[in-house]
């Protein structure tokens, strides 16, 4: 239920209705950081919500990209409008009850948040190239940033290549940081921004320019967003594949941490992640680089369920048993991953780790694993096939829901029938051979003169039943 108070209810006894505490008045009128530059050099910003006359017509013409109207208004000196006129797009009405909010709701806000922009920024963000050219011809400053961002930041974020080119030709700084410490190249992140990045690099943008707080390079951003083409461009232009941000993350760590947004895009996400990781590794990235928490690419790929990436990293020789700062191995990460990893074949991740010498799950933790992954019987199957005995308590059947038992009846019937019972001789032989070759399984198994079917059996091929 929404609650509201009228000014009469909130004002103190004997105080006039429109009275405002001097401190509140100073706080409300305090300029924001982004407005300081403009307030030092010209009149106050035009509030778009209350604008009228030529100011309103100018604002609407810029929004619409009407270059003729913009030109006519700027040609009329009596309007007092200029190419660098600053507009405030915030809503000042929300601050009128500022004093009453403080007193009745105990809410505090130290500054009046202005949202400042210029016609140049609006034209750049909306792709109005001709308006942009007109404003620049009339001496609009390309690096003006009353709201904390330049027009070049806006054009790059929106992916307007033509606007980016116009601004760069006009002298816009390709390495300037915005209020968040990000440079234009950091904002080339969406579809259609590859050409913007190429232009920035051609006009002198630093390929490894770092953001001010996170200390991230553009390659970190491309890797985190799964932008394969941009990562390829940056690497070809000399980006460092092992650059570290403030938390010690390399682009490879960021790439391995790419998450699927839904079950339906899991396969496509893993495919992009694999492309990125292959690209970074071929450029010389360290496959075993650790961050400040000792997390390695393998930990993150396992946690996100990227089976193909796990296989790639293991083929590079990284250890399947390295622990992070919290004592988690890659196998722990795979089994503790989010539920979305179910769509990304966790059984393939688990099998790859076990076939590369990962230490098995402690038997006492198997009931918890069964409860967590009961809807994915292949994951349970591959884990149980590394033991000579099914080490589950007899009451473990209660950990699986009746619906899951019914759906996977054949597998779970075979599983619970083997609790504390001897396994088949064939399975025991597999366990003995794998134990004998422990530490060299990936190299030794393919070299054995065995039929393909038997080789797959030794490599824990899925059968859908336990013997």
Curated annotation (Swiss-Prot):
Phenotype for residue 207 to L: In GLC1F; uncertain significance
Cited InterPro entries: Ankyrin-SOCS_Box, Ankyrin_rpt, Ankyrin_rpt-contain_sf, SOCS_box, SOCS_box-like_dom_sf
Alphabetical GO biological process terms: intracellular signal transduction; protein ubiquitination
Protein location: Cytoplasm; Nucleus
Outcome reported for the amino acid change (mutating residue 356 to Y): In GLC1F; uncertain significance
Pathways involved: Protein modification; protein ubiquitination
Annotated tissue distribution: Expressed in the eye. The highest expression is observed in the iris, with moderate levels in the trabecular meshwork (TM), the lamina, and the optic nerve; slightly lower levels in the ciliary body, retina, and choroid; and very low levels in the lens.
Keyword check for ATP-binding: no
Entry keyword set: ANK repeat, Cytoplasm, Disease variant, Glaucoma, Nucleus, Repeat, Ubl conjugation pathway
Main location: cytoplasm
Annotated ANK repeat ranges: 115-144, 147-176, 180-209, 214-243, 247-289, 293-322, 326-361
Boundaries of every SOCS box domain copy: 412-464
PROSITE patterns reported in the protein's UniProt record: ANK_REP_REGION, ANK_REPEAT, SOCS
Top-rank taxon: Eukaryota
Domain remarks: The SOCS box domain mediates the interaction with the Elongin BC complex, an adapter module in different E3 ubiquitin-protein ligase complexes.
Recorded disease: Glaucoma 1, open angle, F: A form of primary open angle glaucoma (POAG). POAG is characterized by a specific pattern of optic nerve and visual field defects. The angle of the anterior chamber of the eye is open, and usually the intraocular pressure is increased. However, glaucoma can occur at any intraocular pressure. The disease is generally asymptomatic until the late stages, by which time significant and irreversible optic nerve damage has already taken place.
Family: Belongs to the ankyrin SOCS box (ASB) family.
Its job: May be a substrate-recognition component of a SCF-like ECS (Elongin-Cullin-SOCS-box protein) E3 ubiquitin-protein ligase complex which mediates the ubiquitination and subsequent proteasomal degradation of target proteins.
Protein name as annotated: Ankyrin repeat and SOCS box protein 10
Species of the source: Homo sapiens (Human)
